[in-house]
Amino acid sequence: MHACSIRDLKKEYVLKSETVRALRGVSFDVPEGDYVAIMGPSGSGKSTLLNLLGCLDQPSGGELLLGKDNVATMTDDQLAEIRSRRIGFVFQSYNLIQQLTVVENIQVPLYYQGKLGAKERKRCVDLAARVGLQDRLSHRPTQLSGGQQQRVAIARSLVNDPYFILADEATGNLDSKTTAEILSLFNELNAEGRTIIMVTHEDEVAERAKRIIRLRDGLLQSDRLNSPESRQAAAERALALIPDPQDDEEQTPTPIPVEA
């Protein structure tokens, strides 16, 4: 089964008297368990495709299936239902609620469904542990690093068992070390069978995915697989860029003794 299927997808906007064709007939499938990076320059249609995949907008033509649900024929209320229950969003800016704890932030999608029982809370605690935050359950976002906040966002994206995780520049605000950690977490989740669709402008981030789709001028420019060897090489290059803490220690200047 496919997590999503796109057939001749089109999106047009009317700006004053001009019609902008943001997507001109894009087609591809994302099988369950795939890990796809979507890339493209400004104006390629990447953001438009992201909005359609996230059920934030509807296509002007073509077909978009999320699982068995045809998004192209849905009402606004139906789209909202799909967004809240079947898509796991991970944003560049985390989008956490500052007044809530780690567990409460993970639980937000369930809150809107009225699912606030002990069973649901345990699931949120388990997801926090899955992303390495078992010792931060009662912390609020201001008490967490950027990487820890993104881990909360990833756990939140999993709470409804979505068709796929839709990650929009998820490492854009992170340093090289934390980026490597988050991408390793995505790899682990994908190895467990999770489907991940990641939008990025960074080649090194995209090379960690199983597959790279490139858009240009509203069309599918290329769709290629990454070999396991190239993915491993990208991971090793990323690790090589992480500063060694010992280097900082070695470069620390020796204090100059002050004469009495």
Predicted regions: what is each one?
Residues H2-A209, L215:
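ABC family nucleotide-binding domain
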Residues L219-Q246:
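Conserved beta-strand-loop-alpha-helix hinge in the C-terminal portion
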